[in-house]
């Protein structure tokens, strides 16, 4: 990613197209929440028009894993708007949704986090992938 360009999406109920292949068993996500842990329903739609809903959950990026989170990576500090480093460990978490492997994924609809938690809480998704 070039500097100062968007490198994540906010989970805000949007539909994201996924170019899947038949046989995938899981849909994986890398993400984290800010100002508290957050989660909600994520809907996977298959190319045959059927769908399934599962729960997606990410912990607060300034706290270690909890509630079944998996620490995908950690950083020893975060940058502040003033250009200084804040010496606090920051985290990105992994979560996954089990898929019907007899079908092909067409899209995923993200949770509407702002409707479920205080308006200060947000969930950032950095990557989505099939396995």
Task: Explain the meaning of each model-derived region.
Residues 1-131:
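N-terminal/edge-of-domain interface segments
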């Amino acid at each position: 990613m070039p500097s100062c360009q968007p490198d994540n999406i906010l989970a805000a109920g949007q539909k994201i197209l996924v170019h899947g292949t038949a046989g995938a068993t899981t849909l994986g996500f890398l993400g984290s929440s800010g100002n508290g842990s957050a989660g909600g329903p994520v809907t996977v739609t298959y190319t045959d028009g059927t769908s399934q809903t599962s729960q997606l959950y990410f912990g607060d990026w300034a706290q270690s894993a909890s509630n079944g989170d998996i620490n995908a990576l950690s950083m020893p500090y975060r940058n502040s708007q003033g250009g200084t480093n804040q010496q606090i460990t920051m985290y990105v978490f992994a979560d996954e949704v089990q898929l019907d492997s007899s079908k092909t994924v067409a899209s995923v609809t993200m949770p509407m986090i702002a409707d479920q938690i205080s308006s200060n809480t947000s969930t950032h998704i950095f990557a989505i992938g099939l396995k």
